[in-house]
Amino acid sequence: MEHKEAGCQQPEGPILCINNCGFFGSAATMNMCSKCHKEMIMKEEQAKLAASSIDSIVNGCDGGKEHIVAASGSTAVAVAQVEAKTLVVQPTDVAGTSEEVAVVPKVKEGPNRCATCRKRVGLTGFNCRCGNMYCALHRYSDKHECQFDYRTAARDAIAKANPVVKAEKLDKI
């Protein structure tokens, strides 16, 4: 007996993906495998988004509005327009700022030297809190007559790290 169906006939074997990736495709995904089909859909969506963003830049659309771009099928993707950030430049008075020029400290170039014995220290120099660089012999504060007050700095650091907590006095009943 011969069985005839009107319209659709099932293919006799599995169909390879049209991108020749080695996987099998289906008629529902345009003879592509699921991976290639998803990649194709993503590329189409990106192309549509790029085209719409270029159109909005060229046409000068408002930055605060949202536009809805129809994607494949019944899905819709809301695309928020990116507001262009403008840089506000305020003109300054050239004559008024000539007296207010801030002095920028010069960075020492050349060989690094000990501030006490003037010995070259290079990369092995020790920076002190007083702002100078010293060799291994003069790196300690008692060896180079350091002007930095370590006692006050330590006292301030401890006070800052451990604040005094005083509770209010309780009323006697």
UniProtKB/Swiss-Prot annotation:
Zn(2+) 3 binds at C128, C130, H144, C146. PROSITE patterns: ZF_A20, ZF_AN1. Induction: By cold, dehydration and salt stress. A zinc finger (A20-type) spans 11-45. Zn(2+) 2 binds at C114, C117, C135, H138. One of its GO terms (molecular function) is DNA binding. The keyword Metal-binding applies. Coiled coil: none annotated. Zn(2+) 1 binds at C17, C21, C33, C36. Keywords: Metal-binding, Stress response, Zinc, Zinc-finger. The keyword Metal-binding applies. A zinc finger (AN1-type) spans 108-154. It comes from the Eukaryota. May be involved in environmental stress response. PANTHER family: AN1-TYPE ZINC FINGER PROTEIN, ZINC FINGER A20 AND AN1 DOMAIN-CONTAINING STRESS-ASSOCIATED PROTEIN 4. This is Zinc finger A20 and AN1 domain-containing stress-associated protein 4. It comes from Oryza sativa subsp. japonica.
